[in-house]
Curated annotation (Swiss-Prot):
Protein name: DNA/RNA-binding protein Alba
InterPro entries registered for this protein in UniProt: Alba-like_dom_sf, DNA/RNA-bd_Alba, DNA/RNA-bd_Alba-like
Transmembrane intervals: none
GO BP term, example: chromosome condensation
Principal location class: cytoplasm
GO MF, one annotated term: RNA binding
Organism name: Methanoculleus marisnigri (strain ATCC 35101 / DSM 1498 / JR1)
Highest rank taxon of the organism: Archaea
Cellular component terms per the entry's GO annotation: chromosome; cytoplasm
Length: 91
């Protein structure tokens, strides 16, 4: 997958990320990855579900990856959960 087809989910409203996903597919992307960490994970799941159920009829979930990343903070190291949801055109 090309890294340009990745949407990083943060603190903006969900519909901003849905628009980014729909735009990627409308521009000819075969796959789009939605990535998030920590508190933004639920927003990433909402983004995928809204995009699939409301806007993208011919797109399916291909893979979902979950992991834990070690992040350096002021007080040491902490674990942060992350998710990657890969959407692809249905065949």
């Amino acid at each position: 997958m090309i890294k340009d087809n990745t949407v990083f989910v943060g603190n903006k409203p969900v519909m901003n990320y849905v628009l980014a996903v729909v735009t990627q597919f409308n521009n000819g992307a075969e796959e789009v990855a939605i990535k998030a960490r920590g508190k933004a994970i639920s927003r990433a799941v909402d983004t995928a579900e809204i995009a699939l159920n409301r806007f993208l009829a011919n797109v399916d979930k291909k893979e979902i990856f979950t992991s834990t990343e070690m992040i350096d903070t002021d007080t040491g190291k902490t674990n942060v959960s992350s998710i990657e949801i890969v959407l692809t055109h249905a065949k």
